[in-house]
Design a protein with these regions (language model features):
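C-terminal non-catalytic scaffold/interaction domains in large multidomain proteins
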Residues: 77-172, 176-200
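Helix-hairpin-helix
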Residues: 14, 21-69, 96-99, 123-128, ...
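Intrinsically disordered, low-complexity glycine/proline-rich and charged
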Residues: 60-86
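Single conserved hydrophobic/aromatic residue that forms the stacking wall/gate
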Residues: 1-7, 11
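Generic detector of short, aliphatic-rich beta-strand segments that form the cores of beta-sheets
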Residues: 9-10, 69, 187
């Protein structure tokens, strides 16, 4: 059945992610997050271009980690004679939103994040949502200029170390662990730095 094949695919993707994570010495979630693996198991991308249509996979991640995943998916599709959904081949990556581009450009110019939020009519936490999406899709950004301005260096190191040693990048878990000492915003800011440096 379809759902059984999708489950098998998901398990094979997870195993591969685990192998890569050991080999590259990065946490599994840095390679691809669970929702990305689930999307791969339902749409079966078999080229790097198609892989970039998967939520949370940008050009950077596709190039870095994608090759072994698409080979695995290709094998699975052939072995199980799976009909792949057509729409995946049609969609393109061209719809990267103007907002993302403008955020990346402003960060490159070291504009303060609260100012970027204001310019784009966003709440600060909405801006962080956007930046997280940018980083998860494999684009490297450097917000050190802002972090060093608003946080103490040892606080940054403390949160960074937490993510380095953690099994998950889950925000709720981090807040539970660190929330007594740090605000949610501080934790999210350092998590962005961590993901950008580790994953990209």
């Amino acid at each position: 059945s379809t759902s059984r094949r999708q489950r098998q695919m998901c398990i094979r993707d997870r195993d591969l992610r685990k192998k890569l994570s050991k080999r590259l010495e990065v946490p599994p979630f840095v390679i691809f997050q669970d929702p990305s693996l689930e999307a791969m198991a339902t749409t079966y991308p078999v080229t790097l271009e198609e892989l970039q249509n998967i939520p949370g996979v940008g050009a950077g991640k596709a190039k870095r980690y994608g090759k072994e995943f698409i080979e695995l998916i290709k094998r699975h599709v052939e072995e199980n004679e799976i009909e792949r959904p057509e729409d995946l081949r049609v969609r393109t990556v061209a719809n990267k939103s103007k907002l993302k581009v403008s955020i990346i450009q402003r960060i490159d110019r070291k504009v303060a994040l609260d100012e970027i939020a204001m310019t784009n009519g966003l709440e600060f936490n909405e801006l962080l949502d956007e930046i997280e999406a940018i980083v998860y899709s494999g684009t490297r950004i450097n917000i050190d200029y802002f972090l060093n301005d608003v946080m103490d260096e040892d606080h940054i190191d403390d949160i960074y170390e937490y993510f380095k040693d953690s099994e998950t990048d889950d925000l709720e878990d981090a807040i539970e662990e660190l929330g007594g000492d740090y605000t949610e915003e501080e934790i999210r800011l350092v998590r962005i730095k961590f993901l950008s440096e580790m994953a990209n």
